[in-house]
Amino acid sequence: MGTMTIDGRKVEFTDEKNVLTVIRNAGINIPTLCYHSEVSTFGACRLCTVEDDRGKTFASCSEQPRDGMVIYTNSGRIKKYRKLIVELLLAAHCRDCTTCVKSGECILQELAHRLGVRDIRFENTREQHEIDDSSPSIIRDPNKCILCGNCV
């Protein structure tokens, strides 16, 4: 058992496996794309990055909670960092959002809106791949892949 300070608020924790779980249990919503509580930590998306009282940033999904930690989940620096991550993900993503079947239900689209991403300032230099529709039940479009690990 221990106590952390999250955004100025004291929060007690018991045996949570990572800082992200403590933060979410405290009612704070932090975005993630790759995290699943029942699967081993992947830590690829970095959207759950937080900042400690010394200015160190880290992925909250892969850091164990320690008594006395002071965490900031939504500082100006962290907001800019998350926005940049989404911009980079979109830059390497296909640009068919308006015609995509997931438009309006897309987690990446929702994050971009939530974080204020209006334009993609980076050029898309990603190579285009063929769609794999060889299965009658699954269509795999590698051009939509954002390397989150959810499909694995």
Q: Residue spans of the language-model regions?
A:
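Eukaryote-biased recognition of intrinsically disordered, low-complexity regulatory segments
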Residues: 1-9
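N-terminal cofactor/phosphate-binding cores enriched in small/glycine residues
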Residues: 8-67, 76-81
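Fe-S ferredoxin-like electron-transfer domains
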Residues: 46-152
